[in-house]
Amino acid sequence: MNDRVLRVLEFNKIKELVKGYAITKSAKEMVLDLKPYDSVYDVKEHLEETKEALDILMRKGNPPFEGLYDVKEAITRAEKGGVLSIEGLLRIGNMLSVTRKLSDFLARKEEEEEHRILEGMREGLIVLRGVESAISKAIVSEDEIADSASDKLYSIRRSLKEKNSSIRDKVNSIVRSNAQYLQDSLYTVRGDRYVIPVKAEYKSQVPGLVHDQSSTGATLFIEPTALVNLNNEIKELMLKERAEIERILAELSALVYKNIDVIKVNFNIIVELDFIFAKAKYGSDLGGTMPIVNEEGVIDLMDARHPLIPKDKVVSSDIYLGREFSTLLITGPNTGGKTVTLKTTGLIELMGLSGLLIPASENSSISFFEEIFADIGDEQSIEQSLSTFSSHMTNIVKIMEKANNKSFVLFDELGAGTDPTEGAALAISILENLRARGCRIMSTTHYSELKGYALKTENVENASVEFNVETLRPTYRLLIGVPGKSNAFEISRRLGLKDNIIEEAKKVISTESLQFEDLIQSLQEKSIKAENDAREAAILRNDAEKYKNRYKEKFERIESVRDNVYADARREAKQILDSAKEEADTILKNMRDLERMGISSDARRKLEAERGKLRDKISDAEARLQKKKEEQKGEELKKIEVGMEALLPSINQKVIVLSKPDNKGEVQVQAGIMKINVKAKDLRVAKETKEEKKIKKREARLNLRQVDPSIDLRGMDSEEACYTADKYLDDAYVAGRGEVTLVHGKGTGVLRKAINDMLKKHPHVKSHRLGEYGEGGTGVTVVILK
């Protein structure tokens, strides 16, 4: 596809909008490289992947991309065997975490619809729990290794804390004993060594090493001799800490290198998923649909909207071309909205052929074209000193050199910028030449000659954009089959031109021309009325179809529930009777054995006892059946309230009461997705089953496990981070967590401030603080919940 048409139809603006939904830099680059695909197979596959992603968005919400960064640079470094930075390892760890979460997110349950393309991509994801766990255990933030990264590091840092505590006690003692010689009563640190601010004139009173001085020279920063050994010990521990951190980074980098091929594959799949879901999110916000793609040159767009015009201002139109006619001429006055229709059609074609959902109703069709050409707008170059006509003709010449039967050609004001008679003749000749090649053509014009050409030429159709003479503005609704009317006289009258001048002008025009314009106006009025009638009929037809399907679904649901209830009852009754029969057979066998033993007094007693057992067993079976019937019937409701839960025995299902009893004694209830009317006296008290109680208890136990003790907000803007944190705090509070950690990173501090402001007003928060050394420092906030 030529770059000029992408620019002229503003496809680049669409890509910028889609890019805003992508997360990784690599996915954003994929969006910017997006253009129509070269084969109809590729077009259909990429549309299908976008539709699958939209289905998942609608059913499951946004995919778990939180905390994902582009790790292309880190992977490149790891491939060469280099040691990765803390930040690089953290990002790879986050990417592996996203891999695991995405694999779970995209897993299909049995009852869910199949998503062939995305499920195939999911199968390519390989979860590396060991690598992910090793990195997350060792790294706290972009610049901090956790104490628990190794036993040695833990030991070193514990010693560091002890030494720092000792030296602080020592230095405070020195400060107190030398207060008269000091510029300030506070110690400070220079070059990782504790020093005190001594007045220059008293330097001999405080023996030690001078490390620095103030800008005025009045203060010397001296390391007292008594602190030298302690400072040396701290320095040694810091060197050991640095060496251990470098060893840990090298070890983790080696682990990444060992799994680099899998990590690369995972990252490439995640980037592609990021790209696909960006398309789907844009399509969702646009209200887009997946078009039907054909190769016959047929365009059939229902309720098509220009995607760059705000929703509250855009007007939809039905646009079709390629079945009854191959060329559509949109005629009418300048500034009449014709160009918008032209751009809408071309841009929707580009979007669909690039795998994007289109702003049109379901079942709209686009055609696969090898090339789309457009001559729209006045793009002449001042440097080239080209006139409007010359500029357009230069573009048209290039189009004529390349267009074929697989091309869609768009002309804006074909033949304009020169003598009207010559321009119209040239336009007709160009259209005829392209039609002979089999091109599909849409062109705008205000020449009357082209209206006549369309009326008398086979496979060429007139169209116009409806114009409101009262407001002097186009409505932007396309009327196919009706040529455009200039409205020059009526517009002039509305603007205040005197009637006598208008009447004189009409005398100049031939009677045939005036009659033709009047005929056009009549056609427009009839076309608008017919279109409005057709729309109303379509709405009524759709409503009727919805009601038909809704009641059919209700009937099938009731039939299914009733059959299931009967089947369950028969099955349970059979189980009870089978059990009773089995035990009765055993008792009868025992009785026959006793009879064979003879009729001794002892045998008679045993025989009578077995008969008693048989009677008891049969009575018990009958009682159980009766009890089951009573249970199914349930306790009658004494009072009916709207919103209460009740049992409807006829379908053996719990329902929600939606209305009070009417004069017939009926109430409306909701059973699942159905709303039905039943007798109030048929409702029973709904009791919670043992199984439901078990499920609730099990869910309560699982809640705590399902909410992580921390959440990563890095990479989000303030608004998204506050929203995500707010939802997480709600979940953590419900799950019973007492303390959680919000990871926001250090950065510029903007995100940290926004989170802090949100926490001050949050109803579940008891208190909060910044993390301490080893917890993530100022890169995290620890929250205590109420």
Swiss-Prot record:
User: From what superkingdom does this record's organism come?
Assistant: Bacteria
Where does the sequence pass through the membrane? none
What InterPro entries would the database entry show? DNA_mismatch_repair_MutS_C, DNA_mismatch_repair_MutS_core, DNA_mismatch_repair_MutS_sf, MSSS, MutS, MutS2, P-loop_NTPase, Smr_dom
> What are the BP-aspect GO terms?
mismatch repair; negative regulation of DNA recombination; rescue of stalled ribosome
The answer, when asked if Nucleotide-binding is one of the entry's keywords, is yes
The terms under GO molecular function for this entry are: ATP binding; ATP hydrolysis activity; ATP-dependent DNA damage sensor activity; endonuclease activity; mismatched DNA binding; ribosomal large subunit binding; rRNA binding
**Could you say which enzyme class this protein belongs to?**
hydrolase
Keyword annotations for this protein, in alphabetical order, are: ATP-binding, DNA-binding, Endonuclease, Hydrolase, Nuclease, Nucleotide-binding, RNA-binding, rRNA-binding
What EC number(s) are associated with this protein in UniProt?
A: 3.1.-.-, 3.6.4.-
- Which residues are ATP-binding? 332-339
Describe the location of the Smr domain by residue ranges.
711-786
Family indicated by similarity: Belongs to the DNA mismatch repair MutS family. MutS2 subfamily.
Which NCBIfam families is this protein grouped with? mutS2
Summarize the subunit comment.
Answer: Homodimer. Binds to stalled ribosomes, contacting rRNA.
Write out the function statement from the record. Answer: Endonuclease that is involved in the suppression of homologous recombination and thus may have a key role in the control of bacterial genetic diversity.
Q: What is this protein called?
A: Endonuclease MutS2
